[in-house]
Protein backbone atom coordinates (compact mmCIF):
# COMPACT_ATOMS: atom_id res chain seq x y z
CA UNK A 1 0.00 0.00 0.00
CA UNK A 2 1.28 3.48 -0.88
CA UNK A 3 1.48 5.99 1.95
CA UNK A 4 -0.84 8.97 1.62
CA UNK A 5 -0.77 12.39 3.22
CA UNK A 6 -3.61 14.31 4.80
CA UNK A 7 -4.26 17.61 6.56
CA UNK A 8 -5.24 17.73 10.23
CA UNK A 9 -5.89 20.81 12.36
CA UNK A 10 -6.30 21.03 16.12
CA UNK A 11 -8.91 23.75 16.60
CA UNK A 12 -8.72 26.64 19.11
CA UNK A 13 -10.55 24.73 21.87
CA UNK A 14 -8.08 21.83 21.61
CA UNK A 15 -5.11 24.20 21.77
CA UNK A 16 -6.58 26.22 24.66
CA UNK A 17 -7.38 23.06 26.65
CA UNK A 18 -3.84 21.67 26.28
CA UNK A 19 -4.74 18.67 24.12
CA UNK A 20 -2.02 19.08 21.46
CA UNK A 21 0.36 16.48 22.91
CA UNK A 22 -2.39 13.95 23.60
CA UNK A 23 -3.76 14.21 20.06
CA UNK A 24 -0.33 13.97 18.39
CA UNK A 25 0.51 11.01 20.64
CA UNK A 26 -2.58 9.15 19.42
CA UNK A 27 -1.50 9.59 15.80
CA UNK A 28 2.07 8.50 16.52
CA UNK A 29 0.94 5.46 18.54
CA UNK A 30 -1.14 4.45 15.51
CA UNK A 31 2.07 4.43 13.44
CA UNK A 32 1.31 7.63 11.52
CA UNK A 33 4.12 10.06 10.68
CA UNK A 34 3.94 13.81 11.34
CA UNK A 35 5.52 15.26 8.18
CA UNK A 36 5.07 18.94 9.06
CA UNK A 37 3.50 20.88 11.92
CA UNK A 38 2.94 24.54 12.75
CA UNK A 39 0.90 26.67 15.11
CA UNK A 40 -0.80 29.62 13.42
CA UNK A 41 -3.42 32.27 14.02
CA UNK A 42 -5.66 31.73 11.01
CA UNK A 43 -6.85 34.72 9.01
CA UNK A 44 -10.50 35.11 8.10
CA UNK A 45 -9.61 34.73 4.41
CA UNK A 46 -7.85 31.40 5.02
CA UNK A 47 -10.72 30.15 7.22
CA UNK A 48 -13.23 30.97 4.49
CA UNK A 49 -11.10 29.06 1.96
CA UNK A 50 -10.70 26.10 4.32
CA UNK A 51 -14.44 25.79 4.84
CA UNK A 52 -15.59 27.02 1.41
CA UNK A 53 -17.93 24.03 0.94
CA UNK A 54 -20.00 25.35 3.88
CA UNK A 55 -20.38 28.90 2.51
CA UNK A 56 -24.05 29.89 2.59
CA UNK A 57 -24.93 27.40 5.35
CA UNK A 58 -26.39 28.70 8.61
CA UNK A 59 -23.31 27.77 10.68
CA UNK A 60 -20.64 29.19 8.31
CA UNK A 61 -20.12 32.55 10.10
CA UNK A 62 -19.94 30.90 13.52
CA UNK A 63 -17.42 28.34 12.20
CA UNK A 64 -15.18 30.99 10.61
CA UNK A 65 -15.33 33.16 13.75
CA UNK A 66 -14.51 30.15 15.93
CA UNK A 67 -11.46 28.89 13.98
CA UNK A 68 -10.04 32.43 13.85
CA UNK A 69 -10.61 33.04 17.60
CA UNK A 70 -7.26 31.61 18.70
CA UNK A 71 -4.25 29.65 17.54
CA UNK A 72 -4.64 26.35 15.70
CA UNK A 73 -2.11 23.57 15.11
CA UNK A 74 -1.87 22.48 11.47
CA UNK A 75 -0.29 19.17 10.54
CA UNK A 76 0.48 17.08 7.51
CA UNK A 77 0.29 13.42 8.49
CA UNK A 78 1.42 10.46 6.43
CA UNK A 79 0.48 6.79 6.52
CA UNK A 80 -1.28 3.95 4.75
CA UNK A 81 -4.92 4.88 4.00
CA UNK A 82 -4.30 7.88 6.27
CA UNK A 83 -7.46 9.83 5.36
CA UNK A 84 -9.78 7.02 6.43
CA UNK A 85 -7.63 5.99 9.40
CA UNK A 86 -7.71 9.53 10.82
CA UNK A 87 -11.42 10.01 10.07
CA UNK A 88 -12.10 6.88 12.15
CA UNK A 89 -9.76 8.08 14.91
CA UNK A 90 -11.41 11.50 15.25
CA UNK A 91 -15.04 10.32 15.24
CA UNK A 92 -18.27 12.04 14.25
CA UNK A 93 -18.53 15.85 14.05
CA UNK A 94 -21.24 15.66 16.74
CA UNK A 95 -19.56 14.40 19.92
CA UNK A 96 -22.85 12.75 20.98
CA UNK A 97 -22.44 10.48 17.93
CA UNK A 98 -18.68 9.96 18.39
CA UNK A 99 -17.83 6.77 20.29
CA UNK A 100 -15.57 6.82 23.36
CA UNK A 101 -11.99 6.21 22.32
CA UNK A 102 -12.25 8.62 19.40
CA UNK A 103 -10.71 12.07 19.76
CA UNK A 104 -14.08 13.84 19.56
CA UNK A 105 -15.78 11.19 21.68
CA UNK A 106 -13.23 11.79 24.42
CA UNK A 107 -12.64 15.55 24.17
CA UNK A 108 -15.22 17.46 22.09
CA UNK A 109 -17.54 19.79 24.00
CA UNK A 110 -20.10 20.43 21.25
CA UNK A 111 -20.62 20.25 17.48
CA UNK A 112 -18.78 23.54 17.08
CA UNK A 113 -16.10 23.05 19.75
CA UNK A 114 -15.14 19.60 18.48
CA UNK A 115 -11.35 19.85 18.92
CA UNK A 116 -10.15 18.78 15.47
CA UNK A 117 -10.55 19.06 11.70
CA UNK A 118 -9.31 16.45 9.24
CA UNK A 119 -9.60 16.29 5.47
CA UNK A 120 -12.21 13.83 4.23
CA UNK A 121 -10.55 13.02 0.88
CA UNK A 122 -7.11 13.03 -0.73
CA UNK A 123 -8.23 15.87 -3.03
CA UNK A 124 -9.39 18.03 -0.12
CA UNK A 125 -6.22 17.16 1.80
CA UNK A 126 -4.05 18.49 -1.02
CA UNK A 127 -6.07 21.71 -1.23
CA UNK A 128 -6.13 22.20 2.56
CA UNK A 129 -2.39 21.47 2.95
CA UNK A 130 -1.64 24.15 0.34
CA UNK A 131 -3.46 26.76 2.46
CA UNK A 132 -0.95 26.34 5.31
CA UNK A 133 2.20 24.70 3.95
CA UNK A 134 4.62 25.51 1.13
CA UNK A 135 6.10 22.65 -0.87
CA UNK A 136 9.39 23.27 0.97
CA UNK A 137 7.61 22.48 4.28
CA UNK A 138 6.77 19.01 3.02
Swiss-Prot record:
- Give the UniProt family note: Belongs to the NDK family.
Q: Which PROSITE patterns match?
A: NDPK (PS00469), NDPK_LIKE (PS51374)
The protein's job, in short, is: Major role in the synthesis of nucleoside triphosphates other than ATP. The ATP gamma phosphate is transferred to the NDP beta phosphate via a ping-pong mechanism, using a phosphorylated active-site intermediate.
The record's annotation in InterPro entries points to: NDK-like_dom, NDK-like_dom_sf, Nucleoside_diP_kinase, Nucleoside_diP_kinase_AS
Provide the protein name.
Nucleoside diphosphate kinase
Q: Main localization of the protein? A: cytoplasm
UniProt entry tagged with the keyword Oxidoreductase: no
Q: Which UniProt keywords are listed?
A: ATP-binding, Cytoplasm, Kinase, Magnesium, Metal-binding, Nucleotide metabolism, Nucleotide-binding, Phosphoprotein, Transferase
Q: Does the keyword Signal apply?
A: no
List required co-factors. Mg(2+)
Residue positions binding ATP: 11, 59, 87, 93, 104, 114
Q: Which residues form the active site?
A: 117 (pros-phosphohistidine intermediate)
Q: Which reaction does it catalyse?
A: a 2'-deoxyribonucleoside 5'-diphosphate + ATP = a 2'-deoxyribonucleoside 5'-triphosphate + ADP; a ribonucleoside 5'-diphosphate + ATP = a ribonucleoside 5'-triphosphate + ADP
- Which GO molecular-function terms appear in the entry? ATP binding; metal ion binding; nucleoside diphosphate kinase activity
| Compartment(s) where it occurs, according to its Swiss-Prot or TrEMBL record | Cytoplasm
Q: Which Gene3D superfamilies match?
A: Nucleoside diphosphate kinase-like domain
Q: Which Gene Ontology terms describe the biological processes this protein takes part in?
A: CTP biosynthetic process; GTP biosynthetic process; UTP biosynthetic process
Q: Name one GO cellular component term.
A: cytoplasm
The record's PANTHER family line, in alphabetical order, gives: NUCLEOSIDE DIPHOSPHATE KINASE
SUPFAM superfamilies in alphabetical order: Nucleoside diphosphate kinase, NDK
Q: What is its EC number?
A: 2.7.4.6
NCBIfam families, per database record: PRK00668.1 (NF001908)
Enzyme type, top EC level = transferase
